[in-house]
């Protein structure tokens, strides 16, 4: 079934012949949807999309609440050979103007509450039509689905054909549209399914957003390719997740999920029967890893990926899940470390730029051939921009982004080294180390620190706490105490924002 469509075939084949198996239970509404019902709805939508003028290769932009019908729309888009373009629900109309103008989608799907504002933007950008879907799953998208019957014949798509465009977070400069092929998405989900031992007996708690790689191409694709089930939440809800754990086997989350769940009563009992906890999208503190293990008896499995590649490395399912690392390269994926100036491989144990090659790597940046050539080598290696080390046991350590590297007085300083020391100080919840302009050194080190609740921290105390452990040129010149670090919607600390905030500290 769906044999001619590379990705759709692989999303469907695990559930063939098991139409009555539960695919999704919505934990807010209580509605249950079987695999047969889910794919029938996707086929209805695919028919409706084609009737609305969607052609193979057209983009379908989506900025709407997390609902089941959005997953149906994703599969429907794949079925009709179009390109799925999910957009962060936090983007303003002004921000959407850039994405719609750049991608030039055929259709935009949005929340009915924003339709009036976004129609004007869509019209200006040449979008042919606007469909709506609300958090209650009512709207013109649902009407389009319900007006058609199942039985859609999928459009033929090969492994190299485009399946999705995901825009990078754009924390520094213009967002880039990463083009992801049928083959890239299919191969990565199949690899993760096997590496993490997902089967049709698994029940995943799905609380991640679906405009992002983690929630859409990892959580959703892996579940579909395993023929498993998911317990579906519109967003993170600690109480709902705890209530669901006794019926579930796996949870995928960002570090914030785990820190908040650690504050909840009853975690140890709720998690007792779980099989797997996965963390990604932002670094997991070793302290969180250790506390989680102490409370639940489970070791969180941390992995490493990005918009352009999906997942690259993972701590092992069997074997030591080492805190502070992102494990080993996944099967079929090569990871090397190179010198940022020369491009030559660096010796084992030294810091270098992580480069990745494999079937998971994107096809390039949408309408940015020069940027593609800069970051995607002719030999297939993608220059991630992340700084890393590979230890003697083969575990990959992420040191930071190359753009976060601090060069002070001619010395290279890696923020992660300082952050680990600061985070270990009594009374520190977390920290972020940045470089800011300095009249003498070009750049200098500033530590932005969040104290633990009730702790009494001082700038002098933090400086004294790291002084004996760091060379003088690495020691922070200033410590800024704050209530919270700025983060994006996936929990990543926004160092670019902090660099702007404190740019004049030494002016």
What is the predicted role of each segment?
Residues 91, 108, 358, 363-364, ...:
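AMP-binding/adenylate-forming catalytic core of the ANL superfamily
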Residues 32-36, 163-187, 494:
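Conserved AMP-binding A3 loop
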Residues 245-253, 262-322, 334:
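Gly/Ser/Thr-rich phosphate-binding loop
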């Amino acid at each position: 079934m769906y044999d001619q469509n590379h990705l759709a075939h692989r999303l469907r084949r695990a559930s063939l012949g098991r139409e009555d198996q539960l695919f999704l239970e919505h934990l807010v509404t209580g509605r249950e949807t079987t695999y047969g019902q889910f794919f029938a709805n996707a086929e209805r939508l695919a028919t409706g999309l084609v009737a609305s003028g969607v052609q193979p290769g057209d983009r379908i932009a989506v900025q709407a609440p997390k609902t089941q019908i959005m997953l149906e729309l994703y599969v429907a888009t794949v079925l009709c050979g179009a390109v799925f373009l999910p957009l962060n629900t936090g983007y303003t109309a002004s921000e959407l103007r850039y994405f719609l103008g750049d991608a030039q989608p055929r259709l935009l799907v949005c929340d009915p509450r924003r339709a009036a504002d976004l129609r004007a933007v869509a019209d200006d950008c040449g979008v042919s039509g606007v469909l709506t879907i609300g958090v209650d799953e009512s709207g013109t998208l649902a009407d389009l689905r319900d007006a058609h019957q199942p039985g859609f014949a999928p459009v033929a798509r090969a492994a190299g054909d485009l399946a999705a465009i995901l825009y990078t977070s754009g924390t520094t400069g213009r967002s880039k549209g990463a083009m992801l092929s049928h083959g890239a998405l299919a191969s990565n989900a199949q690899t993760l399914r096997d590496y993490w031992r997902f089967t049709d007996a698994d029940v995943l708690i799905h609380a991640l957003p679906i405009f992002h790689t983690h929630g859409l191409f990892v959580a959703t694709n892996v579940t579909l390719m395993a023929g498993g089930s998911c317990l579906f939440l519109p967003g993170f809800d600690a109480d709902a997740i705890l209530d669901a754990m006794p019926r579930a086997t796996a949870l995928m989350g960002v570090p914030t999920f785990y820190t908040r769940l650690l504050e909840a009563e009853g975690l140890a009992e709720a998690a007792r029967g779980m099989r797997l906890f996965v963390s990604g999208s932002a670094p997991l503190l070793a302290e969180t890893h250790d506390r989680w293990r102490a409370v639940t008896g489970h070791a969180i499995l941390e992995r490493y990926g990005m918009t352009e590649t999906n997942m690259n490395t993972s701590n092992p399912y069997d074997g030591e899940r080492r805190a502070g690392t992102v494990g080993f390269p996944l099967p079929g994926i090569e990871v090397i470390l190179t010198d940022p100036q020369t491009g030559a491989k660096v010796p084992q144990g030294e810091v270098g730029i992580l480069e990745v090659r494999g079937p998971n790597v994107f096809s390039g940046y949408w309408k940015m051939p020069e940027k593609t050539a800069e970051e995607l080598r002719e030999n297939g290696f993608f220059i991630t921009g992340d700084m890393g080390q590979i230890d003697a046991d083969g575990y990959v350590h992420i040191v930071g982004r190359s753009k976060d590297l601090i060069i002070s007085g001619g010395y290279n300083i890696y923020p992660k080294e300082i952050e680990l020391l600061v985070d270990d100080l009594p009374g520190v919840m977390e920290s972020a180390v940045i470089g800011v302009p300095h009249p003498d050194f070009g750049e200098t080190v500033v530590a932005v620190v969040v104290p633990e609740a009730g702790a009494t921290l001082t700038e002098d105390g933090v400086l004294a706490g790291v002084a004996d452990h760091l060379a003088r040129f690495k020691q922070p010149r200033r410590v800024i105490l704050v209530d919270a670090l700025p983060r994006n919607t996936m929990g990543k600390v926004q160092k670019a924002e902090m660099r702007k905030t404190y740019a004049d500290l030494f002016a």
